[in-house]
Amino acid sequence: MVNVPKTRQTFCKKYDKHQPHKVTQYKKGKDSLYALGKRRYDRKQSGYGGHTKPIFWKKAKTTKKIVLRLECVEPNCRSERMLATKRCKHFELGGDKTRKGQVIQF
């Protein structure tokens, strides 16, 4: 279980020094219907017949890499950057600090 604080003192490219940053978890945006690959795929799928491209079944990974979105809290900066972390099954943002040997509750 990974617990990350909601704020972090880290380097800001705009100010060229360490500044406090607000930490949030990156989430993938909705796929566009008008991207060329999607338009081509939909065109190929239309009409009679089954799938024209193979559907991927052989998934290997059980977790995703956590990506943190760091936003500078300075009002006239607000620059953002992404920071990839390791894989984990349970991710928590700004949770209570746990003591050694304490039972984990989900």
Curated annotation (Swiss-Prot):
One of its GO terms (molecular function) is structural constituent of ribosome. It is found in: Cytoplasm. InterPro entries: Ribosomal_eL44, Ribosomal_LSU_eL42, Ribosomal_zn-bd. Belongs to the eukaryotic ribosomal protein eL42 family. Component of the large ribosomal subunit. This is Large ribosomal subunit protein eL42. Keywords: Cytoplasm, Ribonucleoprotein, Ribosomal protein. It holds the Pfam family Ribosomal_L44. Component of the large ribosomal subunit. The ribosome is a large ribonucleoprotein complex responsible for the synthesis of proteins in the cell. Its main location: cytoplasm. The lineage of its organism: Eukaryota, Metazoa, Chordata, Craniata, Vertebrata. The gene is RPL36A. One of its GO terms (cellular component) is ribonucleoprotein complex. GO terms for biological process: translation. Transmembrane segments: none annotated.
